[in-house]
UniProtKB/Swiss-Prot annotation:
Annotated localization: Cell inner membrane
Superkingdom, natural source: Bacteria
Known cofactor(s): Zn(2+)
EC number: 3.4.24.-
Membrane topology reported for the UniProt record: Multi-pass membrane protein
Protein name (record): Putative zinc metalloprotease RSc1411
TM helices/strands, residue ranges: 1-21, 102-124, 386-406, 430-450
Enzyme class (EC, first level): hydrolase
Lineage: Bacteria, Pseudomonadati, Pseudomonadota, Betaproteobacteria, Burkholderiales
A Pfam match: Peptidase_M50
Length: 462
């Protein structure tokens, strides 16, 4: 139920904000708005405004979009549509100069970006406890180990050969910078401060790209991990291998299968490599050492459908890391939010471009089922996680609508650019052909996104 409510709320907010952009600028430009609709299909709620325009406000049954209908926006049928009164002709959409039509159409995506900026600024101003980027010892032979990163190194800045290193304050900053570098196919230039206080710069080469496989964890592949305390059991799932072995909440895991369990990430990797195999777990319970035999379970690998199964313990692990309250003053929070929206937009375009040329997996496309799943998970983690999710989806919606594809806002903006440069509108015959192509592209992408959604759903449920 939480997933459904979170998804409906998120979609409703994004649609209302997007269409409010079109509506507000249309009114500002003097265009008469006939209808403001949230959703498509059967009308569930209708209200007619009291103003002279008598704008109709509707809520429809399918909450996967919306629209603002303006006078003179589309071709009219003389036999079916009533004639436009002469006094309303100056207020029709198609009688507006090209710059006004451009502004009205662009306002929808712009409002999505403004919403994202406001939400990111709120999060930066309120602040949150974030893990500090203090590194644990990297696994031998890993990219991090080859770059001579060491335990207790603190990451202070990350960049690339094309982009000067920028300061990082939290572990999430490091993760995002490495993700961006991997997407761009570039080495990461990392500045660290060692335990002795000396600063040095290292190069992380051959970064994996999450664009090729959305499930890849760049941080894990590189071999970076946070400096953490003991690994403990936070929760044991009923009926799991961990429960059958006798694990309890609060147990400290010392060794697994004879190997020291200093990092939760190592422990997870070892467990996944041993589906339906026997192992021993050395623990401390109330200060007393114990050894428990365990027969691991098995689960499907979401990153490799149809491939070998992964081992499963059925216990949630916890490892304390050093955190700090990261927050900004209002002005700095606004600047941070604007940079975040810009970086997210550019990253989305890079991934999309790589998908078009075949350098990125089409599994990066997600549809409403995946979005709903993420909405529910974000909401379950608290209001800050949900607000961050809402901001991210708002940026994605803004970028999507600006793509130069007919039927999207970006397609209309392209028409207006051509009209501005040539002094003539794009012929209606051309627009009709391009619209059919655009609809076909959207249907293809939607079908692919739904296929990815259903594949993930069925895989998750075995």
């Amino acid at each position: 139920m939480l997933t459904v409510l979170a998804f409906v709320f998120a979609i409703a907010v994004l649609i209302v904000v997007h269409e409010l952009g079109h509506y507000s600028v249309a009114r500002l430009c003097g265009v008469k708005v006939l209808r403001f609709s949230v959703g498509f299909g059967k009308v569930l709620f209708r209200r007619v405004g009291r103003g002279p325009d008598r704008t109709e406000w509707t809520l429809c049954a399918i909450p996967l979009g919306g629209y603002v209908k303006m006078l003179g926006e589309s071709a009219r049928d003389p036999e079916r549509d009533p004639p436009i009164p002469p006094e309303d002709l100056p207020r029709t959409f198609d009688h507006q100069p090209v710059y006004k039509r451009f502004a009205i159409v662009a306002a929808g995506p712009v409002f999505n970006f403004l919403l994202a900026i406001a939400l990111y600024a709120l999060l930066a101003w309120v602040g949150a406890q974030e893990p500090l980027p203090i590194l644990g010892a990297p696994p031998p032979g890993s990219i991090a180990a080859q770059a001579d990163l060491r335990a207790k190194d603190r990451v202070v800045a990350v960049g690339t050969d094309e982009e000067a290193p920028t300061p990082v304050r939290a572990w999430s900053d490091v993760r995002m910078r490495l993700y961006e570098a991997g997407i761009g196919g570039r080495d990461a230039i990392v500045q660290v401060r060692g335990a002795d206080g000396a600063e040095r710069t290292v190069r992380l080469r051959e970064l994996p790209s999450a664009a090729r496989s959305p499930q890849v964890d760049v941080i894990e592949q590189v071999g970076l991990r946070l400096l953490g305390g003991p690994v403990t059991i936070a929760e044991v799932l009923p009926g799991s291998a961990g429960e059958r072995a006798g694990l309890r909440r609060g147990d400290q895991i010392v060794r697994f299968a004879g190997q020291p369990a200093d990092q939760a990430s190592d422990l997870i990797r070892w467990i996944r490599a041993m589906p339906e195999q026997n192992a021993s777990i050395d623990i401390l319970r109330d200060g007393l050492p114990m050894t428990l035999p365990v027969r691991l379970g098995a689960d499907a690998d979401s990153a490799n459908p149809g491939g070998p199964k992964l081992g499963k313990l059925g216990a949630q692990l916890s490892q304390h890391v050093e955190t700090e309250l990261i927050r900004d003053e209002p002005v700095h929070a606004l600047g941070h939010a604007m940079r975040e929206v810009w970086r997210t937009s550019m990253l989305s375009l890079k991934v999309l471009g790589k998908m078009i040329v075949g350098q990125a997996s089409l599994q990066n496309l997600s549809g409403p089922i995946t979005v709903a799943d993420f909405a529910g998970k974000a909401a379950s983690l608290g209001w800050q996680s949900f607000v961050a999710f809402l901001a991210l989806i708002s940026v994605s919606l803004g970028v999507l609508n600006l793509l130069p594809v007919p039927v999207l806002d970006g397609g209309h903006l392209l028409y207006y650019c051509v009209e501005f440069l040539t002094g003539k509108p794009v012929p209606e015959s051309w627009q009709a052909v391009l619209q059919k192509i655009g609809i076909a592209c959207i249907l293809l992408l939607t079908s692919l996104a739904l296929y990815n959604d259903l594949s993930r759903l069925f895989l998750a449920h075995g």
